[in-house]
């Protein structure tokens, strides 16, 4: 059609590559959701920041891992926090992990032709532990364990070998951290250390692990 010769209905391959420079992990066990992510931010082959936080919290029992464009992620995070607190103030139905993930996937799908360049794991505990994987086109899948990003092939192998739904929360934290640490050893876009969090009905507990210095609590 005349006038639309330069229009691209899908994002370019160069833009899609932005999503791949990290490693994030999520898994569900009996009484908890575990999220883990490395701390390196890369711009191409340049290490832009060594101490980036890639796990954020919508509330004490709902968290997200973040990968992709920093500006888009900041917008999505602030937007979802506002939606969550608006629903609490309004006194509507309880805000569940699935309802938040569904709301976000609708936002991403509506903007698929000019997408937010993000890859998100959303996990939390409402009546039970839940974990959802969302991509920039608005696809959403519920997972029991998952790894995303450039280091995901390495991390997924560790999860496949060690995952069981009967793991305790602390055992699952160790497994998630080990999966990301394995990716750090083999993937140049994953680095510095790991933040790992355990989310239960009581709230979340977080640990930081670094290969070359003492673990920080």
From Swiss-Prot:
It is found in: Cytoplasm. It holds the Pfam family Proteasome. One of its GO terms (cellular component) is cytoplasm. SUPFAM superfamilies: N-terminal nucleophile aminohydrolases (Ntn hydrolases) (SSF56235). Signal peptide: none annotated. Its main location: cytoplasm. Residues 1-21 form a propeptide. Belongs to the peptidase T1B family. NCBIfam families: arc_protsome_B. This is Proteasome subunit beta 1. It comes from Metallosphaera sedula (strain ATCC 51363 / DSM 5348 / JCM 9185 / NBRC 15509 / TH2).
């Amino acid at each position: 059609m005349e006038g639309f010769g330069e229009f691209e209905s899908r994002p370019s391959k160069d833009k899609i590559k932005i999503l791949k420079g990290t490693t994030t992990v999520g898994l569900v066990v009996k009484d908890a959701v575990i999220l883990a992510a490395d701390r390196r931010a890369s711009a191409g082959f340049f290490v832009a920041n060594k101490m980036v936080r890639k796990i954020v919290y919508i509330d004490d029992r709902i968290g997200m891992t973040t990968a992709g464009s920093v500006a888009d992620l900041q917008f999505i995070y602030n937007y979802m926090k506002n939606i969550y607190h608006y629903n609490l103030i309004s006194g509507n139905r309880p805000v569940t992990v699935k309802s938040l993930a569904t709301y976000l996937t609708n936002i991403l799908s509506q903007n698929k032709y000019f997408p937010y360049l993000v890859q998100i794991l959303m996990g939390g505990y409402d009546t039970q532990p839940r974990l959802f994987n969302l991509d920039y086109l608005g696809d959403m899948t519920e997972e029991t364990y998952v790894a995303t990003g450039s280091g995901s092939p390495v991390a997924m192998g560790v999860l496949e070998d060690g995952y069981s739904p009967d793991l305790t929360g602390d055992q699952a934290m160790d497994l998630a951290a080990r999966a990301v640490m394995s990716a750090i050893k083999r993937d140049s876009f994953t680095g510095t250390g790991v933040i790992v969090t355990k989310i239960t009905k009581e709230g979340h507990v977080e640990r930081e692990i670094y290969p070359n210095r003492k673990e920080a609590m």
